[in-house]
Amino acid sequence: MKNQLIDRLTRYTTIDTQSDPKSTTTPSTEKQWDLLHLLEKELQQLGLPTDLDENGYLFATLESNIDADVPTVGFLAHVDTSPDFNASNVKPQIIENYDGKPYKLGNTKRVLDPKVFPELNSLVGHTLMVTDGTSLLGADDKAGIVEIMEAICYLQEHPEIKHGTIRIGFTPDEEIGRGPHKFDVDRFNADFAYTMDGSQYGELQYESFNAAEAVITCHGVNVHPGSAKNAMVNAIRLGEQFDSLLPDSEVPERTEGYEGFYHLMNFEGTVEKATLQYIIRDHDKKQFELRKKRILEIRDDINAHFENYPVKVDISDQYFNMAEKILPLPHIIDIPKRVFAKLDIPANTEPIRGGTDGSQLSFMGLPTPNIFTGCGNFHGPYEYASIDVMEKAVQVIIGIVEDTAENN
């Protein structure tokens, strides 16, 4: 199977599908259609009925091969790649039997070094796909697409493996947070699903952050500095004051595990107007609400010293902890746990310090945990994929549909 995985991942990663947060269309970029149309053709060649809508959501069905009434399970992956780094002219490189030593990426000065990326130490002996140092790889999430496609191929070649109806979904714009925005849960028509969008071997994730964005706008009064006493209000300094009133220890670089944070993403402005953009994250719903409340309290504390209330706050929720919707349905987690145990894969159920499409889909009526893909260092030139771990991910998909049919 390794050769098929390498061939398919190479073909998919060399197609530029970078999304664009500034775009208002869905998909956000025309080039995502290139991969969507290819996948549609390949699924049809496998004999699967497909449904590609005007927003770039590609669904397909592998029909049940048993008479029993068993749940319909779905598998999802996203076609877009991150806008954080160059995604064009991707030139995948193969490392056979990785020796655990630093590896120079193409003709660049970039080096994939286990001292910097210690997770590489667990991949000694693996076949790796890496970049040439000039682009990201796009294994996030084309590895997930490959794993789903190869699992479907395997199931068709092995009709002795009994399974219920399987739904497949390839979606746009996950990297810019819009993946589920136009996802039609009713049209997808699965009882539950799994995103193949994790990272390290053994990840089985069903807890995510609660997430919000806060935009703080500070309005100043610009007066000639020579006569500014008791008249000037410097919006930049108001922004600095606002940020200083947030807990210094509750930032991404000083938190881990279940610890939440405030993250100042952008701060720009002039004396007259300054804007601060934060993301707010916490796994605990009560703490999440308290964090948003603290933002409003700081606004009020600063505004109390002025007559014209110069600080404005706009908070918008982005997604919520999917555990709230998944934990009441324990079979959705028990199924992959049994499969992991059967395959001798140690399950890592640590919470996601982020979100997936499943975070939103779970609240839209489709409970959707996340499973490892075997890739790492996403969104940059050090991205890699372990073909060996990808092979395990394919086995997990096959095991999930088999277990669902057996245990109903």
From Swiss-Prot:
InterPro entries found in the cross-reference section: ArgE/DapE_CS, Bact_exopeptidase_dim_dom, Peptidase_M20, Peptidase_M20_dimer, Peptidase_M20B
Needed co-factor(s): Zn(2+)
Gene3D superfamilies in alphabetical order: 3.30.70.360, Zn peptidases
Cellular localization per UniProt: Cytoplasm
Record: residues binding Zn(2+) 2: D140, E175, H379
EC number of the protein: 3.4.11.4
Cofactor binding description: Binds 2 Zn(2+) ions per subunit.
GO biological process: peptide catabolic process; proteolysis
MF (Gene Ontology): metallopeptidase activity; tripeptide aminopeptidase activity; zinc ion binding
Keywords (A to Z) from UniProt: Aminopeptidase, Cytoplasm, Hydrolase, Metal-binding, Metalloprotease, Protease, Zinc
Keyword Hydrolase: yes
GO CC field: cytosol
Main location class: cytoplasm
Pfam families associated with the record: M20_dimer, Peptidase_M20
Enzyme superclass (EC): hydrolase
Catalytic residues as annotated in Swiss-Prot or TrEMBL: D80, E174 (proton acceptor)
Source species, domain of life: Bacteria
Residues reported to bind Zn(2+) 1: H78, D140, D197
Described purpose of this protein according to its UniProt entry: Cleaves the N-terminal amino acid of tripeptides.
Record family assignment: Belongs to the peptidase M20B family.
Protein name per UniProt: Peptidase T
Name of the encoding gene: pepT
